[in-house]
C-alpha cells in the first residue's frame, strides 16, 4: 500500500511539472518557434528526409530530432503541448534510463527512485526538458549510450556483451542523426577514465567495432538519401555546424572556459548542497568495484569537453546531469542516514533562494526601486504570481531545513510554484518581443488574408509561419541564420532588402494585402522606420505590425 501511494505521488508530481504547464506557456522565439515550424512543414509536405524552415533548406541539424518533434505534433495536434511533447518524452525516457542505471550500479531501490526525481526537478533539466529544442533528444541518446556500455561491461556472457554494444551503436547512430558527430565524441570521453582505470581496453577493442558498424548502419540510409537529394548537406553540416561552431576563432556563441560553472551551480538547484559531496564521494570511491568512477567520468569528461570548445550554450551540459543525479541521490540518502549537515544546508539554500526571489520581485515591481520596472502597474497580478512561486520555494526549503533527516526530499517541490505559474507571470515587455504568438493572436484577422507576410526576425518568422500554417514568410532586411538557405537560386523570392522594399511593394501590393511584422531595436520608434506609410499599423512594445492594402 505504501509503495502504491509513493507511485501515485510520483506520477502526480510528474504531471504537475511536465504535462500540465506545457500548453499554457507561449512559445519562445527563436528556438521554439523555429523547431515548431520545421516539424509542421515536415508533416505538411511529407518530406522526412530534407529539413526545411520557411520552405528553405535548413541544414543546422540532422533529421532525427525533427522526427520526434513531428510525431508530437502529429499525435497531439497543432498546439503548444504538441510542440513541446518531443522534449518531454525524451527527458522522461532519460529519467527512466537514469533509474535503471542507478539500480544496476548500486542495487538500492531508494537510489533508483530518487535519482530520476533529482534529475527531473533539477532546474537546468526542467528548463530545457519542457522547452522545444533538440538537446533533450541528444541527452536521451547519450544516456542510452551510457547505460548500454555499462550493461555490456557488466555482462557475463558473450551475447550480453554483444547486445550492449549493439545498443551502444544504435544510441550513437541516433545521436548523430539528432545533433551530429558530438554523439560520437561524448561517449568516448565519458567512458575513458573508467576504461583506463579498469584496464578494459581489450574488451573495448574486441567489441567496439560492433558498435561502429551498427552506428554506421543506423545513419547510412538517411545519410545516403539526403546526400542524393542535397549533395551539399554533409559539407555544410560538418564544416559550418561542427568546425566553425566549436573550434574556430570565430566560433558561434564564444565564451570563456569557466562559462558552464555558473550554469552547473544554478542548474543543480534545488539540490545544490548535494553537488560538492556527490562529486567528492564519487572521487573517493573511484577504486571500488561499483560504478562511482564510471558516473563521475560521464559528468566530468563531457563537462571539460564542452568547456574546452570555443562555442558554448547552456543547453550543451544537459547530458552531464543524468549521471550527476545518481551520484547526488546516493550521497543524499547516505547523508540522511548519517545525519550529515549537507541536507540541512540544502534546505537553507532553498530558503535563501526563495527569499531572494521574493526580494527580487519586490525590487523589479512597479513599487520597487527600478527606474523602469519589469512589470507595469496593470500587471500587478503577475507580480503576485511570481511572489507566490518564490514563496513556495522558500516554504519547501524551510520545511526541509527544519527536519532535514526525514523531509530533505521536499526540495523536489521547491520549483513547483515556478513550474505552474511562470507562464502566467512573464512581463508584457518580454512577451511582446520574445513570444510572437501574443501579437499574432491580436492581429490575426488582418494577417490571415495577407497575400505576403514579411518580417525582419527569424524567430518571429517561425512563429508567424507556425501560427498561420504557411511557410512562405518572406525575410525583410535581415537574413540571420537563414542566409545559407536564402543564397540558393530557388529562394530569391524569399528575401526583400530594405532599400528595395518600396519598388517591391509597388510591384506586389496589387496581388493582395502585404503585412510586415518587425522587431525594432531598443529605443526605436515606428516613426523611425524608413518605410512607405502603411494603411494599417499596430505597435506592441518593440514589435510593430504594418499592412499595405491594394490600391
Swiss-Prot record:
It is a multi-pass membrane protein. InterPro entries: ArnT_tfrase (IPR022839), Glyco_trans_39/83 (IPR003342), LipidA_mod_glycosyltrf_83 (IPR050297). One of its GO terms (biological process) is lipid A biosynthetic process. It catalyses: 4-amino-4-deoxy-alpha-L-arabinopyranosyl di-trans,octa-cis-undecaprenyl phosphate + lipid IVA = lipid IIA + di-trans,octa-cis-undecaprenyl phosphate. It is found in: Cell inner membrane. Its EC number is 2.4.2.43. Pathway: Lipopolysaccharide metabolism; 4-amino-4-deoxy-beta-L-arabinose-lipid A biosynthesis. Disulfide bonds: none annotated. GO terms for cellular component: plasma membrane. The keyword Lipid biosynthesis applies. The keyword Transmembrane applies. Keywords: Cell inner membrane, Cell membrane, Glycosyltransferase, Lipid A biosynthesis, Lipid biosynthesis, Lipid metabolism, Lipopolysaccharide biosynthesis, Membrane, Transferase, Transmembrane, Transmembrane helix. The chain crosses the membrane at residues 8-28, 85-105, 111-131, 176-196, 207-227, 255-275, 291-311, 313-333, 349-369, 380-400, 408-428. It holds the Pfam family PMT. Its main location: membrane. Catalyzes the transfer of the L-Ara4N moiety of the glycolipid undecaprenyl phosphate-alpha-L-Ara4N to lipid A. The modified arabinose is attached to lipid A and is required for resistance to polymyxin and cationic antimicrobial peptides. PANTHER family: MANNOSYLTRANSFERASE YKCB-RELATED, UNDECAPRENYL PHOSPHATE-ALPHA-4-AMINO-4-DEOXY-L-ARABINOSE ARABINOSYL TRANSFERASE. Belongs to the glycosyltransferase 83 family. This is Undecaprenyl phosphate-alpha-4-amino-4-deoxy-L-arabinose arabinosyl transferase. It comes from Klebsiella pneumoniae subsp. pneumoniae (strain ATCC 700721 / MGH 78578).
